Structures are given as structure tokens and as C-alpha cells.
Amino acid sequence: MLKGDIMNKKTVIFDLDGTLANIDVRRDRSVKPNGKLNWDIFASPDSILHWDTPNEPVIKMAQMFHNDGFRIVIFSGRNDRGFFATKEWLKKHDVPFDLLVLRPDKFQDKSWPVADGNPATFDMRFMPDEILKKKMLDTFVDINDVFLVVDDRDKVVKMWRDLGLNTFQVAPGDF
């Protein structure tokens, strides 16, 4: 049984790529002959829908927290060009969420809007992931309500832990 203030915390934050979703196939199929990532292929809605696979243990964790009444928030550095494909992928794999926030498309000019339904702000598009997710936290979630964060990237995990948040790192993430 949980005791004290921890019982009042009702938000669990999940990362998407490398955490809820295994992106190995999408990443491998998006590499150019020169070894660099082809961002147009990597960020395309079709690539997300067809190549990403569910990370079942992490999805099960999200389902259990959701079933226990926790608010499930997904913060991702994923480009919002795939916002609707991401929502479709989450639904297809029974990933519950109350809020989904993706990085605004950084490859578009300033006239390009943030994806309809994505609550992110346009200034978030060029931030490194650890700064982006801190901004997302500050904008969309009360830090005092966060029970747990689940992520994979070392720099982001360090940021969460430096804020005093309990954080599970689901995979090595030195990138």
C-alpha cells in the first residue's frame, strides 16, 4: 500500500519512441545509403503505422495504471507530422492516454501550423528532447501530480530524475 503524499499523485508520463513503441524497423528502413536518417521516411505516417511494433510490457504498465485511475500522459519528441497516425497506432495497440503531446514539425517553415489536436506550442520544435519534455511538463502537467515517468533516453531520464521524479528507464538510451 502506498503511503503519504505519493497516494495523491495521479499522473504517469510515458515516452513514445523506444518506450511504448519499438521503432527499430522504422529506423532501419529509414537510413540513407550514406548512413544518415531520411527524416521524410522516418516521420511519415505510413512508416509509423506499418513499421513500429508495440513494446508489450510497457503498454501493459500503461494499461494497469490507467485501470487504477491514473492519468496517462504521453510526451514525445516525435514529429507531429505523424500526429494522427500516432493516435491511430496507440488505439490499434490499446495504449490508453489522456493527453498526447508531440514535437511540432521542425522541418516546416513558420507558416506551417502545429498539427490540429496537438497542444504543443510552436516554440518547442527545435528544442533538444530533455528541454522539450521539461517544457511539456511545465506547460501541461503539475509536477506535484506526477507519480512516475517512463522513458528510455539517458539525457531525458537524467532531467526527470534531477527534478526529483521517480523514473523507470526501459532501455539503454545513449543517443
Feature-to-residue mapping (PLM):
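Short, Lys/Arg-enriched N-terminal segments with co-localized hydrophobic residues
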Residues: 1-6
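Alpha-helical hydrophobic/aromatic positions enriched in membrane-embedded helices and signal peptides
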Residues: 7-9, 143-144
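Alpha-helical substrate-recognition element adjacent to the catalytic core
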Residues: 8-108
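Amphipathic coiled-coil/heptad-repeat helices and related helical stalk/stem segments
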Residues: 54-58, 130-133, 153
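Surface-exposed amphipathic alpha-helices with a cationic face
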Residues: 62-66, 138-141, 161
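Short active-site oxyanion
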Residues: 70-73, 144-148
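Substrate-recognition "cap/lid" segment bordering the active-site pocket of phosphatases
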Residues: 80-147
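Acidic, Mg2+-coordinating phosphoryl-transfer loop and its flanking beta/alpha structural elements
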Residues: 137, 145-175
